[in-house]
Amino acid sequence: VSNESKKKAQAAAAGMQGKDKKRRTLIQIGIAAVLVALIAAIGFSIASKNSDSDAPAAAPSSTQDNGAIRIGDPNASVVVSVVEDFQCPACKQFESISGDTLAELVADNTIAVDYRPIAILDRMSSTNYSTRAANASLCVAEADASAWPAWHKAMFDQQPAEGAAGLSDDELVAIARQAGIESQELSSCITGGTYTDYVTSQTKAALDEGISSTPTVSVNGKVVSNPTPDALRAAITAAQ
């Protein structure tokens, strides 16, 4: 076989390998997307089974219609929405990287932020931590909305590892106390799961909207796929 024939054969083989690699990559991406949606659906299914579907969901008075906790001007023209799960490591990373940027923009009245806690990762703890933490966030908002941002930051600073029991209800109460919340009703709200059914209903609503992963960050309804501080500032400027 001539050298030229060998080179042609090698080139053809390399081309096939390249195509196979690209095909495998696309398949992996597709599988990952399906798994994200499936995991979210499983999370909601578990949450639904753990709630009393016949009981009316107690609705907090401090939230938006979609269950979001608004930080900043109630009438802001630019609103950043953050759909999050307190068990979600990527949510902790987002808070660490972009949380201060959002706080600064809220402080100078550039934006308001709607934090929307849902529970799609209950399966990642043995105590339905996602639901309990989301319930606690609503209890805190009802007790003292001004202290909610500090509590929110502390929750991610102390995020438990996946696969463990998660923080106990007493620990959730303690974090709220450390954030300066003194309400007498707070403890019973958290330990009694006052808003558990509401969390379940809002999680279902989020999934019905097509939200299948956390964090999902949007500016005036437009999703920011890589919500770094620079990307958020650019999206906010475009929305003004």
What are these regions (language model features)?
Residues 74, 105-108, 209-212:
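Extracellular/periplasmic catalytic domains that process cell-envelope and extracellular macromolecules
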Residues 2-51, 174-240:
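C-terminal cap of thioredoxin/glutaredoxin-like
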Residues 61-77:
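A short beta-strand-turn-helix
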Residues 72-73, 112, 116-117, 218:
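Surface-exposed, interaction-prone regions with an acidic/low-complexity signature
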Residues 86, 92-169:
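Structural alpha/beta surface segment adjacent to cysteine/selenocysteine redox centers
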Residues 49-62:
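Ser/Thr/Pro/Gly-rich low-complexity linker/stalk segments immediately outside membranes or between
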Residues 79, 84-87, 213:
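Short pre-active-site segment immediately N-terminal to redox-active cysteine/selenocysteine motifs
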Residues 72, 89-92, 188-190:
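Sequence contexts marking disulfide-bonded cysteines in secreted/extracellular proteins
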